[in-house]
Structure formats: structure tokens, C-alpha cells
Amino acid sequence: MQVILLEKIAKLGSLGSIVNVKPGYARNYLIPQGKARRVTEKVIAEFEAQRAELEKKQSEILAAASAQAARLDGLLVQISQKAGVDGKLFGSVTSANITEELRKQDFPVEKSMIRMPEGQIKQIGDYTVTVVLHSEVSAHITVSVLGETTI
């Protein structure tokens, strides 16, 4: 199915691109989320009329994401978990835990924005985690996992 993108989508295309996608992806995700429209002559004409407005909106979103990335970059997030004497956690620290801590510090992020290259954290220590705020903007934060040892 051919769709015209109304915003930049990572690994798919930029604003105004006409791309072929699987019908289910278009019907269930892109079109309901307002990220794309099915290609017809009428839709292309409407898009060209709204192009400047859409580009302005996208640049505002990018500027807001860049501002938030500047605030987030280098931030230290401390998370306490129960751990054994060897430093191994009982359980693990996931992207949901990191999201919760960031929200406590007034950073509105979603769980899907957190990228943990090593997967879930299972040891005490400091870890670098990436927060993807926009397809072009990301910030690196340090997650410090502290152990609450039980004796």
C-alpha cells in the first residue's frame, strides 16, 4: 500500500515521502496515529497545500526534543534495588523503572524511548542508557544502581 508520510519516521522516510508499506502497518499504525495518509490525487493536492504548516510543526517538535535532550544529557538517575552481597540484584532494573525515576524528576518520557544496549540491568553499578526523544535527537543518561543489602 502506498502512503504519504506526514512526519519523519525512522527507517521509513521523511515528511512528504511516498512509500510502500504493508497494508496492516498502514491501517493499524500509520494512518490511525496521523503519521501517514493513503496516496490519492486529492490527498497529494491537500498535502502540498499543507506542506509548509506540517514542516513548521515538525521543526517545532524537533526544537522541543532538542531542548529536552539538552536538559537530559549527562543526567544521573539513581535507582535502589535489593541486592545480595555479591552485588547481584534480586530482580532487575528495566526501562519502566528508569522511566518512573525520570518522571519523578519532571522529564515526561515513555518506556519505549529508553534504549538499554546491555538489556536489563542485573548488577550494581553505573550504566549509560540512551533516551531517544525524536528520530533525530537522543540523549545519554547515567543510571546508577544502588544495592540495598539484606543481612
Curated annotation (Swiss-Prot):
Gene3D superfamilies registered for this protein in UniProt: Ribosomal protein L9, C-terminal domain, Ribosomal protein L9, N-terminal domain
Q: Name one GO molecular function term.
A: rRNA binding
**Pfam families registered for this protein in UniProt:** Ribosomal_L9_C, Ribosomal_L9_N
Any single Gene Ontology cellular-component annotation: ribosome
Report which superkingdom the organism of origin falls in.
Bacteria
A single GO BP = translation
- The question of whether Ribosomal protein is a record keyword is answered with yes
For this UniProt record, the keywords arranged alphabetically read as follows:
Ribonucleoprotein, Ribosomal protein, RNA-binding, rRNA-binding
Give the similarity note: Belongs to the bacterial ribosomal protein bL9 family.
Question: What the protein does?
Answer: Binds to the 23S rRNA.
The name on file for this protein is: Large ribosomal subunit protein bL9
- Name its species: Nitrosomonas europaea (strain ATCC 19718 / CIP 103999 / KCTC 2705 / NBRC 14298)
Q: Which gene encodes it?
A: rplI
